[in-house]
């Protein structure tokens, strides 16, 4: 292998020049130390509060868990704590499927999930204004109203109000309100029960109801619910007005 001899003088000269430059720079910087402004204080650490820890939820569910009707993601603020806790556990344990939710809660303990549920349940925030108009056909809205307020005895479908409260704002401790939710969210969840893609604690009453509904029924009730105004008091009622029409594992 041929050896190539590198010239020595330019290297030595370059090295001396580099060292000289470093010396000048070092001396110059040393002389300027006293003229530098005081170093800014280190920023405070991220506060370890529940508000900070649930910040990731806001990216999808909106400010403090309050979304508008145009969004796909459901509102969290003011929902019954028992309901939120059950849903978080279902995402963690695989009964509900959503890639982001499954990933975020997969290592969380029951105690931590309960803390998150309690936080969002305790938020008292106004609901976004609901547009009273719908592009759904009148017959579809009429069918949705029937299912929500009366049910369909011929198919053994109980009315939504029998479980979710007369005002459809939910019932403590674990039944959610159905108003103020995006139409697409409601229809997608009912559709997931219809196709056996969403599950809850046994006995899974909503899975039974979902399987008794047609896709037309699902679209009808979701469309009707989406345009209903919020009542003066949008909070969940303290207890059911009458015994539930069927057993639900989420209430145990």
Question: Where are the predicted features?
Answer:
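Bacterial N-terminal signal peptides
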Residues: 18-34
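Extended intrinsically disordered, low-complexity coil regions enriched in Ser, Thr, Gly, Ala
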Residues: 80-102, 180-204, 239
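The feature marks the first
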Residues: 45-94, 98
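Flexible coil segments in periplasmic/lumen-exposed cytochrome c-class electron-transfer proteins
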Residues: 41-54, 63-66, 99-169, 195-252
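N-terminal secretory signal peptides that target proteins for export/translocation
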Residues: 1-15
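Tandem-repeat/low-complexity and Cys-motif detector
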Residues: 74-77, 106-107, 177-178, 212
């Amino acid at each position: 292998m041929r050896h190539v001899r590198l010239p020595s003088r330019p290297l030595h000269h370059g090295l001396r020049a580099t060292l000289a430059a470093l010396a000048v720079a070092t001396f110059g910087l040393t002389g300027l130390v006293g003229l530098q402004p005081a170093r800014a204080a280190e920023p405070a650490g991220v506060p370890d509060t529940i508000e900070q820890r649930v910040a990731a939820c806001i990216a999808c569910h909106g400010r403090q868990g309050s979304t508008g009707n145009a969004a796909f993601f459901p509102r969290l603020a003011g929902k019954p704590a028992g309901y939120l806790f059950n849903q978080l556990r279902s995402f963690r344990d695989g009964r509900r499927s959503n890639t982001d939710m499954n990933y975020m809660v997969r290592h969380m303990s029951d105690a931590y999930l309960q803390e998150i549920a309690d936080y969002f349940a305790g938020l008292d925030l106004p609901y976004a204004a609901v547009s009273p108009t719908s592009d759904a056909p009148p017959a579809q809205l009429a069918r949705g109203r029937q299912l929500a307020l009366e049910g369909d005895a011929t198919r053994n479908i109980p009315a939504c109000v029998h479980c979710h409260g007369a005002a459809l704002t939910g019932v403590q401790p674990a039944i959610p309100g159905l108003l103020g939710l995006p139409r697409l969210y409601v229809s997608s969840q009912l559709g997931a029960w219809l196709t056996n893609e969403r599950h809850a604690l046994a006995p899974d009453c909503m899975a039974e109801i979902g399987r008794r509904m047609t896709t037309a029924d699902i679209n009808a009730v979701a469309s009707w619910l989406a345009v209903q105004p919020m009542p003066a008091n949008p909070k969940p009622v303290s207890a059911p007005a009458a015994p539930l029409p069927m057993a639900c594992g989420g209430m145990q």
